[in-house]
Amino acid sequence: NPLIVHIADLNALAPIVKEVPEKAKILAEKFWPGPLTMIFEKSDLVPLETTGGLNSVAVRFPSDPIAAELILQAGGYVAAPSANTSGRPSPTTAQHVEEDLGDAIEMIIDGGPVGIGLESTIVDFTEDVPVVLRPGYISLEMLQEVLGDVRMDKGLIKPDSKVHPKAPGMKYRHYAPKADLAIVEGPTEEVINAINQFVKEDQANGLQAGIIATEETISRYPCGTV
């Protein structure tokens, strides 16, 4: 997988890419610093080891002040993956990182819990029309509201293992918590009663339960996280 190059200053973008399209500048002004990664044609300053052998580079400008200071102390650029095992969800606390990676890393910088538990949205600007390669916190609708024509990558619908991924998280499954999932179907009252019974049984066994509900039924679940 290619790595994301993290910057802490907009002026750091130009030296590592061949060109910054106008639409990319618009997104940078709207969403940077923040959970948005953009892909450009790389300059000669970016080694192929960083890009996974591709001629493009993924760049992100994070909003966390501690991350920004780390990047600046490292010389203005940090090429790195997310702090989680491939296929696992993004951590939101230092404890999550320690539980997932353990002795595989030498140090954790604890900046407190983060507010967003999703990977950054990745938008490819190497094509004529911007393409979302990885969905994230910034939705397709939010991007289209700013730019107009933005498309979803066809590989998100039908992944092709033979295609070299242009961005992290495209090759393997993503957002995969270690949890059982049950879909309850049927008449509304029966669904509500069944879900409440499932949650009570889980809690009696010392488990935590989360419920995804509609606005019409959300008040009918007294237990669990709704």
Task: Mark where each language-model region is.
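Active-site-adjacent structural elements in enzyme catalytic cores
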Residues: 1-226
